[in-house]
Regions:
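Amphipathic alpha-helical interface elements
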Residues: 1-86, 90-97, 151-189
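Alpha-helix initiation/capping motif
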Residues: 65, 108, 138-141
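Histidine-centered, metal-coordinating catalytic motifs and their short helical/loop contexts
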Residues: 90-132
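Short, surface-exposed, charge-dense and proline/glycine-enriched linear segments
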Residues: 102-103, 142-154
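Extended charged low-complexity segments that act as oligomerization/scaffolding linkers
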Residues: 114-115, 133, 140-147
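Short, highly charged low-complexity linear segments
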Residues: 116-135, 162-176
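Acidic, Ser/Thr-rich low-complexity intrinsically disordered segments
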Residues: 191-193
Length: 193
């Protein structure tokens, strides 16, 4: 049985590490404010653990680091790695999955309204990214929830590892002018959310 307690989905350590790197650039910077993920009990179903991971990631993206999407929009913000486009794509895919899945699990979405059908379709598409040929959400088995949880944790951890590697490059960047532009944009983005 896989232990997910070290994943960003259930642990604040990666977020705190990114905050330390941001702070080392400039004492006014942070990446995520006050991330406190909810824990799961081993006795819970994998579906419940998956939902907890979704709620935690949503909180991380929307409550703690709502400006991250803005910072990742263009290469000339915080992204200094040659893999900047992949980081943007991974963020967009993960954010889309988290927001659509949270929407169907945490809101009263009657399927008799077209808007809710769109949300359900996006959620099912997100699940299909992690579990090809997945059944309807209500028919997913415990084994499939286990696979979904593992793949979600892996995708989130991989994304944040790439972001951390990028932060290492940014911290060691010798182009002071570029670094100062990035810091200014970062402060502006974080203060506007």
């Amino acid at each position: 049985m896989m232990d997910y307690t070290e994943s960003i989905c259930f642990s604040a350590e990666t977020a705190e590490e990114l905050n330390r790197k941001a702070f080392s650039l400039d004492c006014r910077l942070f990446m995520f404010a006050y991330y406190e993920p909810k824990q799961y009990r081993e006795a819970e179903s994998k579906r419940s653990q998956f939902l907890t991971a979704i709620v935690n990631l949503y909180g991380l993206f929307k409550d703690c680091g709502s400006f991250l999407g803005e910072l990742l929009k263009t290469r000339d913000t915080i992204l200094v790695t040659p893999k900047w486009k992949a980081i943007q794509n991974d963020y967009n895919m993960l954010f889309q999955a988290v927001t659509s899945l949270r929407s169907i699990f945490c809101h009263n979405n009657s399927l008799c309204y077209p808007l809710n059908e769109d949300v359900l379709q996006r959620a099912e598409n997100s699940i299909s990214e992690y579990l090809p040929n997945a059944p309807d959400i209500e028919d997913i088995t415990e084994t499939q929830w286990t696979i979904l949880l593992q793949k979600l944790c892996t995708a989130a951890d991989d994304f944040f590892q790439e972001l951390s590697s990028n932060m290492n490059l940014l911290v060691s960047c010798k182009d002071v002018s570029r670094k100062n532009r990035i810091i200014t944009r970062w402060i502006t983005a974080s203060s506007s959310c």
